[in-house]
Amino acid sequence: MRTLLVDTDLTRAVRGALGDGGFAVDVVGTLEQASSAFFSASYEILLLELVLPDGDGLDWLRQLRSDGYSVPAVIMSRLDDLEKRISVFNSGADDFLRKPVSTDELIARMRALLRRSTQITCPIIEFGNLHFDPIGRQVSVDGHPLMIARRELCILEHLLNRAGRIVPRARLEDQLYSFNDEVSGNALEAGIYRLRGYLSRSGATLRIRTVRGIGYTLELTDASSA
């Protein structure tokens, strides 16, 4: 789940905790950078500080809402008086956390927001004998839990969302890695290789097919129709 974090003082540990929780995090420190990032990528959730070097984060969020963007937004700030909190929610924020932030609470609140934002449709993805809960980050094959490492789980999620269709390599890389990450040239291939191992060992009735020069597609195996 790709996240835009607009802040200047959150520690690397917070970003690491979000990564461990299944969030690919892009970190920027100004509203100008936030606008550039927001309009060049697709984000599932925003984390926003109020006081930024080039303006008020609340004004920026207010403009997004007036332009029709409904992506969930969590405000994080040391400013915590009642009037400010009321202003935060009246400006279109979905949640507020006072700094210093507990990463466990932050992740729990983010997942709750994402769960509510997707409740109009069933969040469970089913393909063959595999079930995936994108909010709980849980995978099962024939009802048996399948533990998959975070990066490979992100690959699986994006392939499942477009099952049966070709997912371009560039699109996968864009969704999997934030622009703050240092990514080796064969990182995606290595992740695909490991994910194929997970699926094969679990008896999943689906496979990842390489479309040379383009990307990858997730398809059912012959066993799924036997």
Swiss-Prot record:
GO cellular component: cytosol; protein-DNA complex
Coiled coil: none
CDD domains in the record: trans_reg_C (cd00383)
UniProt xrefs under InterPro entries: CheY-like_superfamily, OmpR/PhoB-type_DNA-bd, Sig_transdc_resp-reg_receiver, WalR-like, WH-like_DNA-bd_sf
PROSITE patterns for this protein: OMPR_PHOB (PS51755), RESPONSE_REGULATORY (PS50110)
GO biological process, one term: regulation of DNA-templated transcription
Record key words, sorted: Cytoplasm, DNA-binding, Phosphoprotein, Plasmid, Transcription, Transcription regulation, Two-component regulatory system
DNA-binding region: 122-220
GO molecular function: phosphorelay response regulator activity; transcription cis-regulatory region binding
Subcellular location: Cytoplasm
Annotated signal sequence range: none
Site (Ancestral phosphorylation site): E49
Transmembrane segments: none
Pfam families hit by this protein: Response_reg (PF00072), Trans_reg_C (PF00486)
All residue ranges annotated as the Response regulatory domain in the record: 1-114
UniProt name for this protein: Probable transcriptional regulatory protein y4xI
Upper lineage: Bacteria, Pseudomonadati, Pseudomonadota, Alphaproteobacteria, Hyphomicrobiales
